[in-house]
């Protein structure tokens, strides 16, 4: 469905992504790496918000730059630390985002109810965003990404700042979405994705280090029995370099 084919990106002559080749189909993909690994850069490229020097990004075999509106209709994105309009109610925020996505005005009330139900936010839609907890705000951002029934969902550090209960709640939301969507979740918190990811992608200083299912990756590293231990091994080695 979505293919990142030999993509490289530089900032001021410093390469931050190195010939990445990643294929995504249905299910949950975890993009793991510390700050500075290139996760947010890759997310911005997938949203067609950032140019790159080499390679291409394909959606169903076609370059995303050529598809334009068709690709955007298939894409839902919740960026890291997106601000909410505190004076808006949750309902008004989702309505505003639906208008930005060119959803038919007659369909918007029904669409707002649909996405709110998916993230268990219906009881709170009339409240102002300023009154929401961190977890509620994050669920609202997930809801706006679901507007228009996109096939591909991108989440950049979706659990940042959430308490353990809110993290678990959001994981349940992601699990419920994976049958009908492709999810790419960028995070440095391994516990957020270890039990739900169908595949894991490790990024290290802009390089693709490994990709595969959790069990498959552990088999490649005898003596390592958890994704968290594998993460620590990879990035402790990075600190020594």
List each language-model region with its residue ranges:
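Conserved ABC transporter NBD signature motif
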Residues: 55-66, 70-71
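Helix-to-loop junction immediately C-terminal to a conserved catalytic motif
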Residues: 47
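Catalytic Walker B motif of ABC-type/P-loop ATPase nucleotide-binding domains
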Residues: 153-157
């Amino acid at each position: 469905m979505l293919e990142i084919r030999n993509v490289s990106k530089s900032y001021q002559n410093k390469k931050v992504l190195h010939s990445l080749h990643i294929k995504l189909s249905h299910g949950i993909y975890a993009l793991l790496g510390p700050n500075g690994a290139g996760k947010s850069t890759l997310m911005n490229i997938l949203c067609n918000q950032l140019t790159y020097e080499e390679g291409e990004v394909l959606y169903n075999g076609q370059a995303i730059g050529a598809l334009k509106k068709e690709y955007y209709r298939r894409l839902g994105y919740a960026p890291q630390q997106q601000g909410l309009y505190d004076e808006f109610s949750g309902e008004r925020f989702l309505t505003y985002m639906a208008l930005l996505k060119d959803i038919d005005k007659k369909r918007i009330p029904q669409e707002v109810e649909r996405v709110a139900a998916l993230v268990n936010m219906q009881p709170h839609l009339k409240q102002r965003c300023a009154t929401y907890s961190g977890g509620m705000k994050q669920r609202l951002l997930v809801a706006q990404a679901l507007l228009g029934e996109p096939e591909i969902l991108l989440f950049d550090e979706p659990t940042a700042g959430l308490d353990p209960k809110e993290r678990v709640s959001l994981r349940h939301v992601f699990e419920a979405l994976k049958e009908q969507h492709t999810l790419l979740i960028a995070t440095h918190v391994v516990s957020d994705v270890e039990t739900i990811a169908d595949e894991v992608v490790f990024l290290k200083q802009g390089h693709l280090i490994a990709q595969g299912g959790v069990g498959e990756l552990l088999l490649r590293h005898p003596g390592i029995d958890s994704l968290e231990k594998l993460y620590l091994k990879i990035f402790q080695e990075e600190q020594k370099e």
